Each structure stands twice: as C-alpha cells, then as structure tokens.
Amino acid sequence: QWASLCSLYIKSKHTYQDLINDFYDRNKHEEISLDRWFSLQAIKYPHGDERFVQKINSLKEHKSFNIENPNRGMSLIGSFCFANIYGFHSNDGSGYDFWAQNVMEIDRLNPQIASSLMKRAMDWKRLNKKYRVMFEKSLHKIESTQNLSINCREMLKVILFE
C-alpha cells in the first residue's frame, strides 16, 4: 500500500487526497506510518503551486503533528528541506523562510535537531544570485534570533563565514 501510494502521489499533479486520507485513517495509530504520511506530503513535487509551502506549513497544525517529537518534526520539516528541492527553492523564497522559521522554533526545543536542519544551508553560496540573496535573508533572520543555541550559532558561523 505504501509503495503504491508513493508512486502515485509524489510526481502527480493530482492530489490523491482521498488516498492520503485513507492511508492516514488506516495507520493513524502507528508512529512510523504517521512519520511516512507527513514525509510523503512534504516531498511532493509542487507543480507550480504558489501556495505549496503554505500547505506544508499547515500540516504543522495537524492533530497528529508534534514538533517536540524529533522524528515527527524531521518527517515533515526535514523531508521538505532536504528532499523537496523544487519546493525548498521556490521562486518567492518561501521555502527558505519556512526553513528558517522552523530552525528557530526547533532550536528552543532541541538544539541538536535544529543544528542538523542548519546543514541544509551548507551550499547556499553555490546558488544563483536570485536564490542566494533570498537564502541569505533567511540566514540573517536566524542570526538575529535572541537566545539562539550554541549549536546553531556554531553552524551559522561556519555557513556564513567559511
């Protein structure tokens, strides 16, 4: 069931929301399946949907999502940031804003997980100018955060200055 859903869902323009909902209903009591459910939606190809990042962000409000659970947080946020290059590098920079917002939020709860999310920025200087400028703004949002953990400050130093 999982493999079939993945092959249908990820690259299709069709949302298959009925299949996604069915998978959730059948597996909502299995933690690993819930992580997969969030991850699958995070890696879907956006097909030019300008609200795609908003849709991913709205999944954080789902009753089964708990950002304090590291596996659940990474299944949605980590999957989007590391595995969805089209969504992450959206034309309006919303993917970078989503990343920065979540790094700052997770840093207050779990600095180790936040610093691992920071690794997504290691290659920002290789982006073309348009994307590099947007990414840099997100990096400076994180940099200006009060009470940022030592873990994230160290990563930020490496990312910005090396």
What are these regions (language model features)?
Residues 1-162:
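Long, ordered, helix-rich scaffold segments
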